[in-house]
Amino acid sequence: FNLAAETHVDRSIDNPEKFIESNIVGVFNLLECFKEYSKKSKSRLIHISTDEVYGDILSGRSNEKFPYKPSSPYAASKAASDHLVSSYVRTYKIPAIITNCSNNYGPKQHPEKLIPKLIYNILNNKPLPIYGKGKNSREWIYVKDHCEALLKIFLKGKIGEFYNIGSNKNLNNLQVSKELINISKKIFKVGKKIKILF
């Protein structure tokens, strides 16, 4: 399972080179090693990617037939790595599968990600930072559900295929913020008025 990647969109805008090194060159190095290893082993490579490769989905959900339209250096680096893996399947016949997952959330997630950042700010009675008007809609999946899907794909997936993984739970950033505030109020005392900053 290749879960290694630089993933923060804003950081990819500030320093795209790091994302190219990790997400493209790193995957190339992995593929070169796996190309030799797979000749002696019955292993398969599961390359974990993101639904960010599809760009902005204005309505509905993305599917495996959607064209790639990355809208950040992060998304572009993941799209490039997906194509690189796919090319190694076709050219060198390596046993690999590509997955594109929606936004994960769960325990021990990096604090710069949206849900942990919002929870931290709620707990510390700080304003909740929301980009634009908070209408950006994303699909969210609990990390354990993502892992279960990866295991199914590992066991039953078809070599060379792309599989989207999601939850069917689309929420915009404003909805996520309000939901977290409501849940927090049920569990413990939070500040009287938590501000949402746009």
Question: PLM features: what roles do these ranges have?
Answer:
Residues 116, 122-198:
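C-terminal substrate-binding subdomain of Rossmann-fold SDR/epimerase-dehydratase oxidoreductases
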Residues 1-104, 124, 144, 173, ...:
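N-terminal Rossmann-like NAD(P)+-binding domain of SDR-like oxidoreductases, especially those catalyzing
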Residues 107-111, 169:
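Residue-level signature of the cytosolic catalytic core of signaling kinases
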